[in-house]
């Protein structure tokens, strides 16, 4: 699973979920993409589950790009722990996703396979998504 090698701060603030994605909101590498329509946190486990589902459905064909990275640690306390005694230890990693962010890109497969594999990956995401096709994409004859 994805996680940063090192971070500036071990325990960041939670932050807010306002606004649109200003960067990472256009198809840059592939011909097809999965785009987030609402804000949320996507964990490293969910990113990996989506990647596995897409690569298995495409039978390892084509090329897949993951356009998000879990760079924010989420802390948790043990169950039935008394209040106080500081903030909990980092438990898992998340990627902060805003509406418009491209999550995955895919190239080298037909549109039907890309659409179906992205649908399977979308079921594993905690946010609503939509399927995008690059503007200058021309289907192979």
Swiss-Prot record:
Region of interest: Disordered: 1-21
GO molecular function: rRNA binding; structural constituent of ribosome
Annotated keywords: Chloroplast, Plastid, Ribonucleoprotein, Ribosomal protein
Biased composition regions of type Basic residues, renumbered to the chain: 1-17
Record's keyword annotation contains Magnesium: no
Pfam families, per database record: Ribosomal_L16
InterPro entries: Ribosomal_uL16 (IPR047873), Ribosomal_uL16_bact-type (IPR000114), Ribosomal_uL16_CS (IPR020798), Ribosomal_uL16_dom (IPR016180), Ribosomal_uL16_sf (IPR036920)
Entry's Gene Ontology BP terms: mitochondrial translation
GO cellular component terms given for this protein: chloroplast; mitochondrial large ribosomal subunit
Assembly information from the UniProt record: Part of the 50S ribosomal subunit.
Membership in a protein family: Belongs to the universal ribosomal protein uL16 family.
Name by which UniProt lists this protein: Large ribosomal subunit protein uL16c
Organism, scientific name: Ostreococcus tauri
